[in-house]
């Protein structure tokens, strides 16, 4: 759970064809729930989704919302794949519930 923006595009670019990126970290609004609260370390709205589109990844799942597994937090989650890939190999799932569970 650490955001270092200067390396986000590089991280996505390191994926080989069929490679998968699963990423979760805190988003703007998390200040209401605790740390991190520094905007430099909080994702902007749809930032992970835009990263995937900008770097040519296919989004298998994206979420932005509150979870309270250990304590409430506002997070973004992304599951994406570098094409080409077999679409049947990626199970699509529904959004998380309040506990962060599908």
What are these model-predicted stretches?
Residues 2-15:
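A short, conserved alpha-helix within the catalytic core of class I
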Residues 39-63, 76:
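Short alpha-helix
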Residues 18-30:
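Conserved beta-strand signature within the Rossmann-like core of class I S-adenosyl-L-methionine
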Residues 33-36:
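Short acidic, glycine/proline-rich loop/turn micro-motifs
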Residues 64-102:
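Core SAM-dependent methyltransferase catalytic element
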Residues 3, 27, 63, 84:
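Short, flexible active-site-adjacent loop segments at beta-strand->alpha-helix junctions, enriched
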Residues 1, 38:
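Short gly/ser-rich anion-binding loops that grip negatively charged ligand groups
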């Amino acid at each position: 759970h650490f955001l270092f923006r200067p390396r986000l595009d590089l991280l996505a670019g390191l994926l080989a064809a069929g490679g998968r990126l699963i990423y979760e970290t805190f988003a703007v609004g998390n200040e209401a729930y605790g740390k991190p609260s520094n905007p430099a370390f909080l994702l902007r709205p749809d930032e992970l989704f835009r990263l995937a589109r900008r770097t040519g990844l296919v989004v298998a799942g994206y979420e932005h919302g509150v979870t309270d597994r250990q304590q409430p937090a506002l997070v973004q989650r992304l599951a994406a794949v570098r094409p080409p890939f077999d679409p049947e190999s990626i199970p699509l799932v529904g959004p998380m519930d309040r506990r962060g569970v599908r």
